[in-house]
């Protein structure tokens, strides 16, 4: 998207370096972008106007919320052709996938990893996004759960409760993998396992809910 990338990466690196030299906590920060998927994404990466996560092979991208890109598969193929592993941010929030949840399966079959938002499980983005997030999680179609926080807000105090609920939903081993093990593998630029998944199925009530405009 023209004009979408406004972050000065050199400035961000400088800020990060200053924080690291002056910090008085054990919090570790890593540089990376959540990148809007565009046809010239590989050019932006080569020009350092967009970067992978922590200078690894993993690239976090997002889609428009209202219109499904026509050439999304071509753009994903181009990313992978450059040796990068695409991670789709907050897939549960793209309502144009709700009627055909097999789209998520096709992404994962192509090697795309999916990163869900903590806030979605708490209803922050509406009941449909919450239901979709739960379905993706239960179907083994999620590889990360993250905050998607771009600025200070009220999400952090809610995360322990959300994690408790998620542990009850699918088990603490699974949640630990999505919030701790896989993110650490990413930071080390190691491969992340894509496990066997099951098909997403709706009951009649869920289907009516997800098909509404």
Which residue stretches match the model-derived regions?
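Extended substrate/RNA-proximal surfaces in nucleic-acid metabolism proteins
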Residues: 5-115, 193-213
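Short acidic/histidine-rich active-site segments
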Residues: 141-157
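Short loop-to-alpha-helix "cap/lid" segments that border enzyme active sites
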Residues: 126-132
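Short acidic, glycine/proline-enriched helix-loop-strand junctions
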Residues: 6-9, 25-28, 154-182
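Short active-site-adjacent structural elements
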Residues: 123-125, 153-157, 187
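Mid-to-C-terminal alpha-helical segments outside catalytic/metal-binding sites
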Residues: 164-213
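Short, conserved active-site loops that position catalytic residues or coordinate cofactors/metal ions
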Residues: 1-2
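Conserved, mostly hydrophobic/aromatic
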Residues: 90, 148, 183
């Amino acid at each position: 998207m023209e004009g979408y990338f406004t972050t000065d990466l050199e400035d961000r690196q400088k800020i990060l370096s200053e924080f690291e030299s002056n910090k008085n906590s054990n919090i570790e920060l890593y540089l990376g972008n959540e990148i809007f998927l565009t046809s010239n994404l590989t050019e932006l990466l080569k020009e350092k106007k967009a970067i992978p996560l922590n200078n690894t092979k993993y690239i976090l991208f997002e889609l428009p919320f209202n219109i499904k890109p026509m050439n999304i598969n071509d753009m994903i193929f181009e990313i992978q052709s450059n040796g990068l592993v695409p991670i789709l941010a907050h897939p549960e929030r793209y309502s144009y996938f709700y009627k055909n949840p097999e789209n998520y399966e096709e992404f994962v079959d192509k090697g795309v990893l999916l990163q869900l938002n903590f806030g979605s499980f708490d209803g922050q983005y509406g009941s449909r996004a919450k239901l979709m997030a739960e379905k993706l999680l239960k179907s083994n179609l999620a590889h990360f759960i993250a905050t998607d926080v771009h600025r200070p807000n009220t999400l952090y105090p809610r995360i322990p409760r959300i994690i408790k609920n998620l542990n009850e939903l699918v088990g603490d081993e699974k949640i630990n993998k999505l919030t701790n093990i896989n993110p650490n593998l990413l930071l080390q630029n190691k491969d992340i396992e894509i496990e066997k998944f099951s098909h997403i199925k709706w009951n009649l009530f869920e289907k009516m809910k997800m098909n509404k405009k």
